[in-house]
Structure formats: C-alpha cells, structure tokens
C-alpha cells in the first residue's frame, strides 16, 4: 500500500542518516533540526554545500554586537569590524529599526547579569554549545532572553521546536549557576517585529535527555 511504501521510505532515510557521522559538538539552535528532520540534516552533513552570507545573518551579527557594546560588554564578537568595513553605512542603516525597537523594549533599561555567556551542556556523547544572549534578574530568579532578528514562529509547532533552544539554555544556566530550573525563565525577543515570545512550558532535563536519545 501507499502507507507501507511511505513507511519503508522513512525507514530507509533514517537508516541512511545513521550512517552519516554527525558532529559531537552541536549549537543549541540546531537541536530542533535534529529532532524535526534528522535525515535531511544528515544529508546536509553528507553533502555540505557552500552558503553565501545572508543579509539576515549579517544583520543578526551586527545587532548582537551592538547590544553587547550598549551594555558595556568587554568582549565583542570577532569579525564585526570586517563586516562593517565591507559596507559600513549600508550595514548600519539596515539595523536602525532593530536598534529603535530594542530601545523601546522592556530590556532597554535593565542591567543584565550576563551578556553573551557561553555554556556547554553534555547529553550522552554530544556537547551542546549554548550562547546566552542575556540573563536578567527577576523577583525570584532569572530570565534568559534570546534576541532574534528573524521571523516569529509561524505556528504552535514551529514555536515548540524553537523552544527547544530555550530549554537547553535553561538547563545550561541551571548547571552553571546552581539555580533550580523552576527559578529560570526563558523567552525570545523578535526584534524586527518588536514581539516577545515566552513559551508556556519548557522541557526539563530528563525530557531533553529522553528526546535526544530517541532522536539519535
């Protein structure tokens, strides 16, 4: 039947994915790609294609560096000068609205506890690289905020996949700081839309480990 054929194709794709050596070190933002479509991700690793830098990626790099500088971070991301020097006026003009949106956000007048804090979390044989854009104190704990210069989640499924990144960040900061997970909130700020997205629920440590083990 057609269903049997589709199931066979899926099993074949998963079998092929298992033959591809996947990286041991994984950016937290890629967790969702493993979970949502491992065969497609494995194919990209099997046949890597050179990618041109996208305007959105460049804008994201510039915006994150600007926020770092605004909060007085001593360490600015490497490579920002080279991006600016290629076409500084055009690059700066393209993020003016992002800056304006940030200045009107609730984050603008807060002092972060952490800015661009990198923490590594190990699950099984893999290490996830978690770079927390900012951490702010709350009344009874902290809130992790991830600045996004791209588009908001298009639906509930998309949001739940993106939220895996926040769940990893929360776990990472819990291990780093010693704070229990329930004292750590996490949210996205989609700067271009001036929109905050805070998932109602984030996976806990055991759930993340189980999900990863099921995926790999």
Please state what every model-predicted region is.
Residues 1-73:
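C-terminal, charged and often intrinsically disordered regions of DNA end-processing helicases
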Residues 24, 43-52, 79-83, 147-157:
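Glycine- and acidic
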Residues 26, 37, 54-66, 90-93, ...:
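Generic recognition of stable, solvent-exposed alpha-helical segments in well-folded globular domains
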Residues 38, 45, 65, 117-119, ...:
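Residues immediately flanking
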Residues 46-124, 197:
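A non-catalytic, helix-rich entry segment at domain boundaries
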Residues 119-176, 198-199:
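Non-catalytic protein-protein interaction segments used by genome-maintenance enzymes to assemble
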Residues 171-216:
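Metal-dependent nuclease catalytic regions and adjoining charged, substrate-binding loops involved
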């Amino acid at each position: 039947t057609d269903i049997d054929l589709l199931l066979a194709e899926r099993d074949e794709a998963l079998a092929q994915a298992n033959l591809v050596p996947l990286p041991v070190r994984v950016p937290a933002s890629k967790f969702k790609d493993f979970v949502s479509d491992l065969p497609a991700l494995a194919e990209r690793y099997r046949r890597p294609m050179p990618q041109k830098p996208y305007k959105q990626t460049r804008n994201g790099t510039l915006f994150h560096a600007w926020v770092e500088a605004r909060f007085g971070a001593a360490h600015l991301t490497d490579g920002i000068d080279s991006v600016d020097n290629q076409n500084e006026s055009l690059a700066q003009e393209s993020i003016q609205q992002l800056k304006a949106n940030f200045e009107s956000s609730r984050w603008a007048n807060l002092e972060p506890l952490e800015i661009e804090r990198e923490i590594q979390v190990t699950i099984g044989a893999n290490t996830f690289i978690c770079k927390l854009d900012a951490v702010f104190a709350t009344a009874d704990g902290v809130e992790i905020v991830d600045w996004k210069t791209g588009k908001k989640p298009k639906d509930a499924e998309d949001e739940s996949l993106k939220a895996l990144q926040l769940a990893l960040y929360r776990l990472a900061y819990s291990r780093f700081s010693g704070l229990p997970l329930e004292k750590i909130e996490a949210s996205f700020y989609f700067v271009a839309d001036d929109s905050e997205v805070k998932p109602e629920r984030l996976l806990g440590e055991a759930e993340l480990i189980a999900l990863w083990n099921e995926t790999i």
